[in-house]
């Protein structure tokens, strides 16, 4: 029996595999008719229907025909299925052609939790997923159980398991800064249960900052910059059209504006409960960029997570929850 943690986000797909192996790739894929080659060699092409339909994924998928998830953690959607297949393939789990018994720990936002869990279990649980690789290798995965937790609970469970936070009176607020949304989950730290009325999703994410920086670079160079390059330019200067663009000095004001909008909306939604917050927990890719600002919401309560764990916090917690359920 193999247990993995899987976090299919709108921006990136994260996997915690065997021996804690960590995998991350952009959450996008595209149907392809031919094999392609990149600088590093042949681009991986997968299939989930015996080779009839082939697709590329992650950073290799580009152009006008790319497909992306409908939202975070929507595992039952047809847009997410190739990403799940790619995640399993990338994990390296296989058993010489015979099915591997697999338990998947994953999560989805609290607002649609029951609906998404029901759909995901119907789509994946007790099903054998067959993935064909670029050289015709076939790997099969028997999903014996799918353990789902609300998005954000995964991060809290991981931190609790690591001793970074403790069960205590008060609220823990997980702020997951994603590509398209910022999901806020408030947890009662005594019983680790979500506080539904203080949990919400903001239609604000790092993608807003990327789009703003992309427009700024386009105005400067006269060319539209690829999304991936604009994303990289948020944190460091990059070369584009033989010119150095982006970097902290250029992106700083854009990220400040993003942080201000998120903080203002969180304060508004938490209303008079801020005094009960004992742990603010920024996670997600955006937390690397603006996480330090969240201490303004409840000074002195921000939990510092290792930078390399920020993007994987939910997936780590999902895997832990799946292991505990066995």
From Swiss-Prot:
> Does ATP-binding show up as a keyword for this record?
yes
> What does this protein's UniProt record list under function?
Polymerizes into bundles of filaments. Polymerization requires NTP and is optimal with ATP, but GTP, UTP, CTP, and even the deoxy form of NTP can also support the polymerization reaction.
> Is Nucleotide-binding included in the keywords of this UniProt record?
yes
Q: Binding residues for ATP, per the UniProt record?
A: 10-14, 179, 231, 285-288, 311
Instruction: Report the superkingdom from the record.
Output: Archaea
**InterPro entries to which the protein is assigned, alphabetical:** ALP_N (IPR040607), ATPase_NBD (IPR043129), MreB-like_C (IPR049067)
Q: Which GO terms describe its molecular function?
A: ATP binding
Name of this chain's protein: Archaeal actin homolog
Family under the similarity heading: Belongs to the thermophilic archaeal actin family.
Alphabetic keyword roster: ATP-binding, Nucleotide-binding
